Amino acid sequence: MNVSYLSKRFAEMKKYETDCMNKLMDFAKFLYIQGHLSITEFRNSMKVLEANGAESPAYEMN
């Protein structure tokens, strides 16, 4: 799983292109939840996206 594959799938489904790693990370999570990615593909995509600057949002617990 690489960034170009996720970008291509994103553009096909969303009808626009993005180079935002955070959007691609959210999209990879969506694909995993929908059953389009295996756990191995999901984990590998998360590693690649994080290496390219993607960040999960930080949530504050009050």
Swiss-Prot record:
A UniProt-annotated Pfam family: YppF
Lineage top rank: taxon: Bacteria
Stated name of the protein: Uncharacterized protein YppF
